[in-house]
């Protein structure tokens, strides 16, 4: 008879030094009993408390625009700060091409609150609200889920004092300022007809304001401002509503009135319910370390989940160029051309969402490329000499055209264009493969065959273009030239990005076509060409401008950016590591591991740029110390805002650094990018963790780590697909039991890889096959709300 599950659940707070100590997803030493969160066949986590550990605490008012707090419902976003009592900027992601703001709201009568000596505030990420209190007043701001309306609920106001709120735009904007007695609106439309690649479509912005109070009156105070005045209710409460829907023109007052009337019927609970349901879905983390650095990173990862949900649920991505555009507090200013998307700055967000178990937050990313497929096909045919398939522009307008329009260049730059002069992304031809591989990863994680069928044309057309662009040498080799090694090396032979793209994409297309039972001819051609792809280029650090012989693995040899290593470098990228991530060709073992490690250690740009993938690539390679040091270094360098968001170039809030951080934490805890589940492949021993990470086939790994030891290891099966697990305790006998019945489903084995054939909806414990010591006490993973700002070196989350 098998031992009970509880018999195996043990925890060690020190290193295990004897094989007689056991674990079943949990390690045990009878002398140092601990706790496990596993009971009755599942992992128990008190989600509300864990999420609220990451609330952002303000002990002083956030008076400056750069101190603004982010809010949003995935379509309408806000930046909220305390300038002149209360200021909020509304932002949408569909006011193309310049992503113009619908306006700012100012409530000067809230100065009594923000000027109070007892002022305090909390960005409540569990509720999706910004809560302020002071001087006997409270103000709670949020964006409704059902409608694109921001709501400010105030209590403690003096009913005798006239309240006011203004909705304002600025020069050179030219809105129509409209009032109808109890509400005011600013409406503006424009044509997308000036930039290169213009769509000719009409876009616009509409914002409308009203209040739930007494003696309400609206007036136009200037061509750019409407104002409402009112008294609070007798109990001192009032509510201000500001609606901002998608706007392409029409009867602005009628549309505004309809929206605001509907919004007046919404309750706070409706909005909170959505957020509470949202927080039931992601895999959460509770991290701790003696220096509290782990807690700080946990906070940033939770903020990443929060901002992703707040900005990523519209028809197209809310973020471009790595910026949190929906959280802007600087009017209509943009560092980067706001009509375009940079794929390089989206990819970490896609990956982080997958590992968090939130694939639905990638819907707008895939829609950007799927819906623009006809335009990308046309672009490729026009600018790539009539070739078939798609060359996806690395920098692509929202309408699928490969123009980068910047105020600081005299002529729009072309992407994926054989007819362009050499430039950063003029001939970056690997982006289509990257998008395709994220389609494939999303399918592997979700098993959604309908999704795969809808997006498969991206894979097919990307592969067809690469076949058409590449040429064969007399020996049969398949090569690309002229081609960019992303933005760093222009018009070179066989960039590492191209080689990696084809090595990764071709097998994915073959498998996808087989699943969907289509394109057998293409699959056969790709299978044939796989044998003709070049190996990765190599150089020796002693002579970095000269290629070494193929497959040279001598000391000092690293992966080069292309087969033209002496080519001029134009950007600070580590392209020799692209085969590690995102392409997943090299991991923490295998014949290329050693050279990849050397490439990482000798990378030219260490912890450079807020989008740096250093910590993710370190985790993929199993470099624990490098994962930790790079994650901390990038955070201390770029996370400068009290909201937890980053600064990079310009004055906008960047979300990409938190995306890298979230992805890196997940990757260091659990990896499953190639069908092999790796447990804690790069997790620091001085960081404790209680975490859930998504894996392929709708699965989840629940993991508790203490001082480097695995305390609990449970797997939730989301499908009947087989799961391959690398032995978490190399060389030791491991078994897997059904978590509810305790019936062994995998007999004890000391093999390097353990296979599990799960039952949908069942959970399993992975454990050592020998158990000793006392059963561990059950204790759910719990947390308490943050009550102070957090700090990491010179950086802070919150305001002291």
What does each model-identified segment do?
Residues 725-741:
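Solvent-exposed beta-hairpin/edge-strand motifs
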Residues 161-172, 714-730:
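Surface-exposed beta-strand/loop patches in extracellular or lumenal glycoproteins
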Residues 461, 465-515:
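Acidic/histidine-rich catalytic neighborhood
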Residues 342-378, 385-393, 398, 414-417, ...:
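Active-site core of glycosidic bond-cleaving carbohydrate-active enzymes
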Residues 32-66, 71-339, 359-363, 369-381, ...:
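Acidic/polar, glycine-enriched structural segments that form the non-catalytic walls/loops
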Residues 99-110, 652-701, 706:
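Catalytic cores of secreted or luminal carbohydrate-active enzymes
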Residues 150-156, 502, 701-703, 710-717:
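Short, well-ordered beta-strand segments enriched in hydrophobic/aromatic residues
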Residues 324-336, 396-425, 480-495, 563, ...:
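Acidic/His metal-coordination segments adjacent to aromatic residues that form catalytic metal sites
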